A protein has these predicted regions:
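Membrane-embedded translocation segments of transport machinery
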Residues: 207-210, 214-517, 562-570
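Intracellular leaflet-associated regions of eukaryotic membrane-associated proteins
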Residues: 609-774
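N-terminal alpha-helical transmembrane segments of multi-pass membrane transport
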Residues: 2-155, 173, 594-600
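Transmembrane-helix boundary/entry motifs in multi-pass membrane transporters
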Residues: 26-36, 70-76, 104-122, 150-170, ...
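Flexible loop linkers connecting adjacent transmembrane helices
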Residues: 19-27, 61-67, 95-112, 137-162, ...
């Protein structure tokens, strides 16, 4: 197995045995990258881009179908992963908060203000504008909690609460996990700043081979998918804003509007390219501070132009609701009954067939989209957090990435979401007032997009009969200058809110467009920086700017392709890409939890971990080494020691083949070694027969399910029972040989690679177990 020898810089010695190729280019330091990792990203991303451009309708159909399948089968996985990560972060904060992302003597590279600005700009910037008003209104109109809350006041605060659920701790949990894991791996353990380093305690030396290449390569795909979602949202928002403020005259859902969005993407991509080439300390840091200052100014102005007392009350109330409901109750809500469709058990209300609560796909369109989006961004934002967190403690990082953004979300959504909901309620008030006066549209005016809005009067008294008795209503408007108010729910909601404040609408809108554009740039340039790190084995070397330009162009191309695919349904294409890309990465995040747990415990209890033994054959090795051999053209590594990765010997091949085809035979051999003697032969044979029956039953029932679908349940019962028995065997062998691991890893190994598990155990049993200490 070998590195790609073509073009390796003369005299270069790899610090870590990862593939590295170098291509000299005139007037530049050249291109240096991991060829396998880069190829994975390039092939998948440009393949997706070309597919979407060549066949927009077909690609949208495929993406939507993939999204539907992902959410249909894996809602539970997305939902349960997030609170697990949050509780794990709480554990680290309490018990290991003083451990540093770096050496004990190192100090933070960036000050608190610039540090928070860069984190926040990379993390959630653009989305705050796109969803700041529209999301609370969507949740309000859906009567999301119709079965439990009945007053309009409760609808309003719960709409804000649900929005905060999506943008609070759950949004930042994947970022913080990867940030802390990568920071400790890189700056304390001296490993490369890549995703593969986060799972080094799990894969060991095999991190530097094919498995690590696969993790980093797919991380590139997921990073670009997540960034493109934000780029698409930013393009939609910028074009909508400029169209409303100028005479562009773009018609909604037209080809001209889509073209304008694509132009916006490439303008910002060009700016992002200049930023990423200029480096972290100048371009990204400066723009991040500028973006957060501009958005803070906008939020401050709206807070004091609107009903300040109401918004401050809402902030306080939202805090209480958030910690009462979102930490546990809503955090584990999968909307199990709500996702049922009509004909499959959806609840009905009297004669209504629409059911209670939101529509069946609500969970897919909102919570699952968000969790997938945050997951897709986790390697990008997490590695970026790690890159700028050197010298900070775990506790400090959690302060800046959990407490800070959560507080900002409370302020932002209470201000803009509260203003939007109050305007929505005022529309209903004014319509009712006009109805009492004989004309529901008495106060109707034209909104900025031509839709119907309303101008609330300053003071009106209306007398109307109720049950035969005349009742007088007094309508007293304390804020007559806040007009017109609009009830439209969608992308336009943001601009409607900004344009209702006296005559300041255009000014506020331009400030918003400026902020969105800056966040747009910071998302793209930060993403390009991290993708380049992943493609270049974690090396952040000056002079190799051309490869960062390439990745910035790739992000722009994929975002363009998704917008071309979706057109009027651009958001659907963007959401689908994030959800599908985020699924396998959710599994990776669970593995990162294991890796981080071992990192902090090895640091806290080094003597305990020094006593553990390793498997003679790694689960990541064995026949999987053939993949590394093929990728390295069968050669020998010339610039690093990789003797642990070699062509499998005949024993390994035979044990794996036997386990793959005849697992009961392997189980019998294992049991005879674990429990030798004639007195144990019957029990050993019995277990082997049971394993064989489950294995054969799985295959037979799985094939038979083609004719009778219901048999699939029994097939999976057989397989998981089979895998669990093998996991117990692995657990016993680990205990006997004092090998590091846990039952979760054992079960996972049994499910995803039973043949590898059995071969691993048989080869391990060739050695004598360590003597017990008295």
């Amino acid at each position: 197995m070998a590195d790609a020898k073509v073009g390796i810089a003369e005299g270069e010695v790899a610090e870590f045995p990862m593939r590295s190729a170098y291509l000299p280019i005139p007037f530049n330091a050249g291109i240096k990258c991991n060829p396998v990792t880069s190829a994975i990203g390039i092939i998948i991303l440009w393949g997706l881009a070309i597919y979407c451009m060549v066949d927009p309708e077909g690609s949208l159909t495929s993406l939507t179908a993939a999204k539907a399948g992902t959410t249909y089968y894996f809602t539970w996985l997305y939902i349960v992963t997030t609170p697990i990560i949050i509780f794990f972060m709480a554990y680290l904060y309490i018990f290991h908060g003083n451990q540093k992302l770096g050496k004990d003597h190192e100090k933070p590279e960036f000050g608190a203000g610039s540090y928070f600005s860069m984190i926040f700009s990379a993390g959630v910037g653009i989305g705050l504008f796109f969803y700041g008003v529209s999301e609370p209104l969507w949740h309000l109109s859906d009567n999301r909690f119709d079965t439990g809350f009945h007053s309009q006041a409760e609808y309003g605060v719960h709409a804000i609460n649900l929005t905060l659920y999506h943008w609070g701790l759950g949004a930042w949990a994947p970022y913080v996990l990867v940030g802390i894991a990568a920071g400790i791996a890189s700056y304390r353990e001296n490993l490369p700043l890549t995703m593969r380093s986060c799972i080094y305690p799990v894969l060991g030396e095999y991190t530097w081979g094919f498995w690590g290449d696969l993790v980093d390569g797919f991380s590139i795909v997921v990073v670009v998918s997540g960034v493109c979602t934000s780029l698409g949202l930013g393009a939609i928002q910028i074009v909508d804003g400029v169209n409303l403020l100028t005479d562009l005259g773009l018609v909604a859902d037209s080809e001209e509007e889509n073209t304008a969005r694509i132009i916006a993407i490439w303008i910002v991509t060009g700016a992002a390219t200049l930023s990423v080439v200029s480096g972290l300390n100048f371009g990204i840091k400066f723009l991040s501070i500028l973006a957060i200052l501009a958005s803070f100014v906008l939020c401050f102005l709206v807070l004091f132009l609107d009903d300040t007392r109401f918004i401050l009350n809402l902030m306080v109330e939202a805090c209480g609701w958030y910690f009462q409901y979102n930490v546990v109750e809503v955090a584990f809500a999968t909307d199990a009954f709500g996702q049922l469709t009509r004909g499959n058990g959806r609840g009905i209300d009297g004669s209504s067939m629409s059911g209670l609560g939101a529509y069946a796909a609500w969970m897919n369109d909102w919570t699952i989209f968000y969790w997938a989006w945050w997951t897709a961004w986790s390697s990008f934002v997490g590695l970026f957090i790690a890159r700028i967190s050197r010298g900070r403690t775990i506790r400090e990082v959690i302060h800046f990435t959990f407490a800070g953004p959560l507080l900002y979300a409370f302020i932002w959504f209470s201000t803009f979401g509260g203003a939007g909901i109050r305007a929505y309620y005022r529309v209903r008030e004014v319509i009712q007032l006009g109805t009492l006066q004989g004309d529901a549209d008495m106060y109707a005016v034209s909104g900025i997009d031509g839709s119907t809005c309303y101008a609330p009067p300053a003071y009106v008294e209306v007398t109307a009969p109720v049950d035969g008795v005349n009742i007088t209503w007094t309508f007293e408007n304390e804020f007559p200058g806040i007009s017109p108010v609009c009830g439209t729910i969608g992308d336009i909601s943001w601009w409607n809110v900004l344009h209702m404040y006296y005559d300041y609408g255009p000014f506020l809108s331009w400030v918003a467009i400026f902020s969105i554009a800056i966040y747009f740039v910071t998302s793209s340039d930060s993403g390009s920086l991290i993708v380049d790190l992943l493609a270049n084995n974690g090396r952040d070397e000056p002079g190799f700017w051309i490869q960062r330009v390439f990745w910035a162009m790739t992000e722009g191309a994929v975002a363009t392709a998704l917008l071309m695919s979706g057109k009027s349904d651009a958001l659907k294409a963007l959401q689908a890409a994030s959800i599908v890309a985020g699924l396998p990465f959710t599994v990776l995040l669970c593995t990162v939890c294991i890796g981080l747990y071992r990192f902090v415990h090895q640091h806290a209890e080094p003597e305990k971990y020094e006593g553990y033994n390793q498997w003679k054959m790694s689960f990541a090795g064995g026949v999987y080494c053939y993949i590394d051999t093929i990728l390295s053209c069968g050669g020998v590594f010339s610039n690093a020691d990789r003797s642990y990765i070699h062509v499998p010997d005949m024993r390994t091949n035979w044990e794996t083949l036997r386990a793959l085809c005849l697992p009961p035979w392997s189980v019998l051999l294992i049991m005879n070694k674990l429990n030798p003697g004639r007195q144990n032969y019957v029990s050993n044979m019995t277990l082997a027969v049971v394993v064989g029956g489950l294995f054969a039953g799985w295959i037979f029932l799985f094939i038979s399910s083609v004719a009778k679908t219901s048999l699939l349940a029994f097939a999976w019962l057989c397989y998981f029972s089979f895998a669990f028995i093998l996991a117990i065997l692995r657990y016993e062998v680990r205990a006997k040989y004092n090998i590091i691991g846990n039952i979760g890893e054992d079960v996972g190994a049994g499910i995803i690679g039973y043949y590898q598990l059995l071969a691993q155990i048989l080869i391990q049993l060739d050695e004598e177990p360590p003597a017990l200490e008295l």
